[in-house]
Design a protein with these regions (language model features):
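Sec-dependent N-terminal signal peptides
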Residues: 4-14
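Sequence-pattern detector for short linear motifs
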Residues: 5-6, 26, 207
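Generic, well-ordered alpha-helical scaffold segments in large soluble proteins
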Residues: 12, 55-66, 114-121
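Sec/Tat signal peptide C-region and signal peptidase I cleavage site
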Residues: 16-19
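Intrinsically disordered, low-complexity polar/charged tails and linkers
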Residues: 22-86
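Long beta-strand-rich cores associated with HINT superfamily self-processing modules
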Residues: 86-240
Length: 240
């Protein structure tokens, strides 16, 4: 079972790299890539995203404060990350949901009310686009996203429990979650925060900096790491 999980995850990584480099994915017929990213559109959409960021953060803060949540600073996708995602998904920059995003972390028991409030309030304001739940059983990861429509650009609000945020986010965790929450999670798990983000950066690398052996090891280590938060994960059903 363990070997099959690693095999399919490595296949996913190989295909992701192939898409990013404009090559044929494993199991597909050889084709010549005709896709070209409109870099001028990338520049324009990133500029528009900077105008949307403050409104998204204000909206997220207004809901999070009602449910004991904490909001990360706004995150704008970099030029290179935007190009990479366009190539991977064969879309232009105006089709990407997360040019601007933030994350709300809250106690597990507040997730349902938080997400319901986000969705319903966004609908009332006419900015709701969609809700999405992600669950990766083999990696012990789950998370929820509310996508907002701001006209020319969309924004993404990720919603995680304190535990999943502790495992996944690349932020100063004490500043974000507070010392009491971080100490509690670290005492329970014995683990440092943010290691899943570290492993993910290795897994998704397309520059050649890491070998396939490095990526396979990162997948194994990431799975072990996230399984230490398994009790929290098993509760992670769809919340809305």
């Amino acid at each position: 079972m363990r070997k099959s999980v690693i095999f399919f995850m490595m296949l996913f990584v190989i295909n992701m790299v192939c898409h990013a480099q404009g090559r044929t994915a494993v199991g597909q017929e050889e084709t010549v890539s005709e896709f070209h990213v409109d870099t001028a559109l990338v520049v324009r959409m990133r500029y528009v995203a900077t105008a949307v960021g403050p409104a998204m953060i204000h909206f997220a803060d207004s809901i999070a404060m009602l449910h004991g949540g904490k909001v990360t600073p706004v995150n704008y996708k970099s030029f290179q990350s935007t190009i990479r995602k366009c190539n991977q998904e064969k879309v232009q920059a105006n089709e990407i949901n997360d040019l601007v995003r933030c994350t709300i972390a809250c106690p597990y028991d507040s997730l349902h009310s938080m997400i319901t409030d986000l969705v319903q309030t966004a609908k009332k304001k006419g900015i709701f686009k969609k809700y999405k739940h992600q669950s990766y059983l083999d990696r012990g990861y789950w998370g929820d996203m509310v996508i907002l429509n701001h006209g020319m650009v969309t924004s993404e609000i990720q919603i995680k429990s304190f535990y999943m945020a502790y495992a996944n986010l690349d932020v100063n965790m004490v500043d974000f979650l507070g010392e009491d929450v971080c100490t509690k999670i670290k005492n329970e798990t014995g683990l440092e925060s943010g290691m899943s983000h570290h492993y993910y950066e290795i897994i998704r690398d397309v520059t050649g900096k890491y070998s396939w052996e490095d990526k396979e090891k990162a997948i194994e280590e990431n799975t072990k790491y996230l399984q230490c938060f398994w009790e929290d994960y098993e509760k992670g059903t769809k919340f809305y």
